[in-house]
Amino acid sequence: MASVPKPPKGHFNLLYFAGATSFTHKDYEPLPAPLSLAKLFAELEARYTGIRAAVLDTSLVTINLDYVDVPADGSGHDVVIQEGDEVAIIPPVSSG
């Protein structure tokens, strides 16, 4: 992944890795902040139909390099992404 520019004012950067990059055909994209983690997942499902089941349900998430818990029930309203944050979607990687 190349260097990611700062997000525009009022936004955060969402970084995609591995299967998330393949699914979205993007390395990153800026999204409006603030946004709860639950709303982020809903927004991604609206933009990329099927991403929740194919990628998000088995991925790890970081905010500013700190791992955050992603509840299995899809909640996550208490985790709020702020302007300028860097969020990463990290799917499992298999080795062989």
Model-predicted segments: where are they?
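Ubiquitin-like/PB1-type beta-grasp interaction modules and other compact soluble beta-rich domains
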Residues: M1-S95
